[in-house]
């Protein structure tokens, strides 16, 4: 549940500034209190729900994208996506506070990395987790990508970093969908609608997808058990759901971060097929 909790408190803190922070406060004060609130809530929630303080500080080498890692690397992309999405939530708030686009992009990345780092440090004092430098690298990579795409809207119009959750595959289900890697995919979407060179109105509804996912890690219990673990890469063509729905509803940009399942045709390659 820890990643779901992180996402919820991030949304609560970052989306509420318009009404929760007094209009009489300076933008610097609003930014300060937003970050103090995020840090305090992370500390309180982590101590209560994630057993921070139950053990002494320790590091944990989780590996990268190897087949024998805990999640085949899908969790690393989950960290990157969290850092990316959180940086944009913060940047959105900073613009509402009165910061210009460049400052909002920079401070959004800093705040995202700060929150994610605080959580990782808290994990170092947990019996279950531990500080992972691999996680930290992908936290930073996600925040950096968030900075680039917010700072440069001409790139943002062309590229999205998305997570896709498909509830239908078989296997053990988790209440926390953000760590249910049996049903998650991560992808980069290149949107035809962002390129002026694409003039055909129908082609502008299409996207190129490149992504990664892992499967069957939750059912593997160790040596001697059935081992169906697999890591997959894919390339595909998808529909721009935001553009499709824009004449009818304002999606608020949510589909720039979340990929709707079954709206693309993919060619998959299993990296572990013998």
Give the positions of each predicted feature.
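Cleavable N-terminal export/targeting peptides
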Residues: 1-25, 274
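Hydrophobic alpha-helical membrane segments
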Residues: 21-274
